From Swiss-Prot:
It comes from Caenorhabditis elegans. The keyword NADP does not apply. This is Putative histone H3.3-like type 3. GO terms for cellular component: nucleosome; nucleus. Disruption phenotype: Worms exhibit slow postembryonic growth. The modification N6-acetyllysine is found at residues 6, 15. Keywords: Acetylation, Chromosome, DNA-binding, Methylation, Nucleosome core, Nucleus. SMART domains: H3. Gene3D superfamilies: Histone, subunit A.
Length: 127
């Protein structure tokens, strides 16, 4: 016991030493963003961009597959495939925008098939 009547103070480890002791013992968790943060970042990125979103070769195969039903051995210029892809993506982006508005109208943030069906029905599309 000390002459003043108090017990001697314990030495506290420095902040850096404590941090190192914790890090050495455990594996650091990877950083995770809150749900929706990455999605919003992707939405902003794709809204800024003007490039095509669908891969060219899979789209070209799809066009050729559909064209087979109309006529055998059809040939396409690359500019024709590109024009079809531009028009298709323009249509799909607009449809998804309308679908999102239908989901928001229903007080939801997640789009569902019924939202897309409603959007197409309002637009007057069939099938």
């Amino acid at each position: 016991m000390c002459p003043g009547g108090k017990a001697p103070r314990k030495q506290l480890a420095t902040k850096a030493a404590r941090k190192n002791a914790i890090v050495v013992g455990a594996v650091k968790k990877p950083h995770r963003f809150r749900p929706g943060t990455v999605a919003l970042r992707e939405i902003r990125r794709y809204q800024k961009s003007t490039d095509l979103l669908l891969r060219k070769l899979p789209f070209q195969r799809l066009v050729r597959e559909i064209a087979q039903d109309v006529k055998q051995d059809l040939r396409f210029q690359s500019a024709a495939i590109q024009a079809l892809q531009e028009a298709s993506e323009y249509f799909l982006v607009g449809l998804f925008e309308d679908t999102n508005l239908c989901a928001i109208h229903a007080k939801r943030v997640t789009i569902m098939p019924k939202d897309m069906q409603l959007a197409r029905r309002i637009r007057g599309e069939r099938n």
